[in-house]
Curated annotation (Swiss-Prot):
One of its GO terms (molecular function) is glycerol-3-phosphate dehydrogenase [NAD(P)+] activity. It is found in: Cytoplasm. It catalyses: sn-glycerol 3-phosphate + NAD(+) = dihydroxyacetone phosphate + NADH + H(+); sn-glycerol 3-phosphate + NADP(+) = dihydroxyacetone phosphate + NADPH + H(+). Gene3D superfamilies: N-(1-d-carboxylethyl)-l-norvaline Dehydrogenase, domain 2, NAD(P)-binding Rossmann-like Domain. This is Glycerol-3-phosphate dehydrogenase [NAD(P)+]. The lineage of its organism: Bacteria, Pseudomonadati, Pseudomonadota, Alphaproteobacteria, Hyphomicrobiales. Its main location: cytoplasm. Catalyzes the reduction of the glycolytic intermediate dihydroxyacetone phosphate (DHAP) to sn-glycerol 3-phosphate (G3P), the key precursor for phospholipid synthesis. It comes from the Bacteria. It comes from Bradyrhizobium diazoefficiens (strain JCM 10833 / BCRC 13528 / IAM 13628 / NBRC 14792 / USDA 110).
Length: 326
């Protein structure tokens, strides 16, 4: 089994900072890369990131804006938003001269290409060994060392297991998998479904409706996963059902918070990127290409595109023909 002694986290937002703390707790030599030199200097000197207030960065984490320095690490965690993943890996590609694990830590599908995160990595960097980290996790919880469990998947089981050994600790428990596509579908779909759950809360439709929406949403996620060859245990595991339950239950989820705002007729929360808003139309197109029925996801995409009002979407879902549960 390969041992990874050094880890670089690309992206010094809240999630990137939390992952740097994870790697440091696991005993790795950690570099946190920030695109903005001033931002990097501030974090390095104060050991505080304004994007993750109240969390003090471990003293041995190196913070830099020099990409070449970060790229020397044994493994790379890409903590940029999904739609910026290709740009980040493109920048890294010329610095990666040997097989190096490149782990996507964002949940989504690339616009335009309809590529999943590991596919983007494989295209953008010749020597990258693509992997995906996903599951029920909030940056604040992870950074503070609260117990968290996630899934880390790569095509080769030995690589996935080695990555888990490199990042795991008593408070951060990754489970390894080779079902890369199943993990990616769970993370992408749950973001869209969390927006729908937030709309239910914003519209004050009640706890029963929220439970029904979450359950039927999982049915959509599972149908798409099966159509794409995902394993049932992945879809019902941490990166599928687990992440869906978390994202549909608290406004800490940016997608859930966006849904609440939409349901109340308010503006979207300022400065909060909700990946589900970008993923919704791509997810619906992916489902259509595989002849998978995803009415909740379709409703979210239509609402976000101003093609359907929330009231019309709710009525449409509630008046669908009765059928057997699946």
């Amino acid at each position: 089994m390969t041992a990874f002694h050094s880890v670089a986290v690309i992206g010094a937002g809240a999630w990137g900072t939390a992952l740097a703390m994870v790697a440091a707790r696991a005993g790795r030599s950690v570099t946190l890369w920030a695109r903005n030199a001033e931002h990097a200097t501030r974090i390095a000197s104060t050991r505080d990131n304004p994007r993750l207030p109240g969390v003090r960065l471990a003293p041995d984490i190196v913070v830099t804006s020099e990409l070449a320095l970060a790229a020397r690490a044994d493994m790379l965690l890409i903590a940029t938003p999904a739609q910026h993943l290709r740009g980040a890996v493109n920048m890294l590609a010329s610095h990666i001269a040997r097989p190096t694990p490149v782990v996507a830590c964002a949940k989504g599908i690339e616009h335009g290409t309809h590529k999943f995160m590991t596919e983007v990595i494989a295209e953008a960097a010749l020597h990258a060994q693509p992997a995906i980290l996903s599951g029920p996790s909030f940056a604040d919880d992870v950074a503070r060392g609260l117990p968290t469990a996630v899934t880390l998947a790569a095509k080769e089981e030995e690589l996935a297991s080695s990555l888990v050994q490199a990042l795991g600790s008593p408070t951060f428990r990754p489970y390894h998998s080779t079902d890369v596509r199943g993990v990616e579908i769970g993370g992408a779909a749950k973001n869209v479904l969390a927006i729908a759950a937030g709309i239910v809360v914003g519209r004050n439709l009640g706890a029963s409706a929220l439970a029904a929406l979450t359950t039927r949403g999982f049915s959509e996620l599972a149908r798409l996963g099966r159509a794409c060859g995902a394993r049932p245990e992945t879809l019902s595991g941490l990166s599928g059902l687990g992440d869906l339950l978390l994202s549909c239950s608290t406004a800490q989820s940016r997608n859930f918070a966006l849904g609440i705002a939409l349901g109340r007729g308010e503006a979207a929360p300022a400065g909060k990127l909700a990946e589900g808003a970008f993923t919704a139309p791509v997810l619906v197109e992916l489902a259509a290409a595989r002849n998978v029925d995803m009415p909740v996801s379709q409703a979210v995409a239509a609402i976000l595109d101003n093609k359907l009002t929330i009231d019309a979407a709710i009525e449409g879902l509630l008046t669908r023909p009765f059928k057997a549960e699946e």
